[in-house]
């Protein structure tokens, strides 16, 4: 290679290096920031998961400790002292209502109603509270109100639909409509999302009422 060619190559290489340095000075911080965000984001996610796990374990320990009290009133008081947010609050309300059922049924039913109407709770907890209130309240809750609550819970796609249909059938029995109750329960047995326990319970009731479950 001639000296002029060598000279031009050296100049070209220097220009490339200068240009690269300029790019790094101008845009290098973006690459560094991207790396930091990736690394930092991963670290943040891991920390958040660990923190969530620790909080869940602490919550579980607090609940178990509260339920170890011998007296139902002490258990309710201990549960009330647990700091909660979101779904945890719903769980505490349901547990407290269950404990109250042993000593103060009216207070338990009122607690379940409050939980079912608390829009700050996840929908699943509100629906469960409503169903438990219907079951626990029985005839103390007007028939039309129970029917209305169960109709909403028994809509297609609702997670508690099978149990709501079972309770709807029991309401029909309470009103002296065994044929309608059998029809509801046989339809329930044909559905795929019915648990084995519920299926056995409903089957026994249908048979006791003289219904036919041979094809179910």
List each model region and its residues.
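Short extracytoplasmic
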Residues: 58-94
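Solenoid-repeat scaffolds in large eukaryotic assemblies
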Residues: 56-59, 74-79, 108-109, 146, ...
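Transmembrane signal-anchor/signal-peptide helices with a preference for the extracytoplasmic
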Residues: 15, 39-61
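Soluble extracytoplasmic domains of inner/organellar membrane proteins
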Residues: 91-111, 115-216
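Alpha-helical membrane and juxtamembrane elements of multi-pass inner-membrane transport
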Residues: 5, 14, 18-21, 60, ...
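Short Lys/Arg-rich amphipathic alpha-helical segments
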Residues: 31-32, 45, 137
């Amino acid at each position: 290679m001639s000296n002029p060619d060598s000279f031009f190559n050296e100049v070209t290489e220097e220009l490339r290096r200068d240009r690269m340095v300029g790019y790094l000075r101008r845009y290098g911080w973006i690459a560094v920031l991207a790396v930091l965000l990736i690394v930092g984001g991963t670290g943040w996610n891991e920390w958040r998961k660990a923190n969530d796990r620790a909080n869940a374990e602490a919550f579980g320990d607090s609940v178990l400790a509260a339920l170890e009290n011998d007296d139902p009133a002490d258990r309710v008081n201990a549960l009330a002292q647990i700091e909660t947010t979101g779904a945890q609050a719903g769980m505490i309300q349901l547990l407290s209502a269950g404990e109250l059922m042993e000593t103060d049924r009216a207070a338990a039913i009122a607690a379940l109603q409050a939980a079912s109407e608390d829009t700050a709770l996840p929908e699943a907890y509100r629906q469960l509270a409503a169903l438990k209130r219907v079951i626990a309240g029985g005839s103390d809750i007007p028939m039309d109100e129970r029917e209305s609550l169960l109709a909403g819970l028994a809509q297609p796609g609702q997670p508690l639909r099978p149990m709501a249909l079972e309770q709807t059938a029991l309401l029909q029995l309470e009103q002296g409509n065994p044929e309608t109750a059998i029809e509801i329960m046989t339809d329930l047995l044909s559905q795929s999302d019915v648990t084995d326990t519920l299926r056995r319970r409903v089957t026994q009731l249908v048979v006791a009422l003289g219904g036919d479950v041979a094809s179910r």
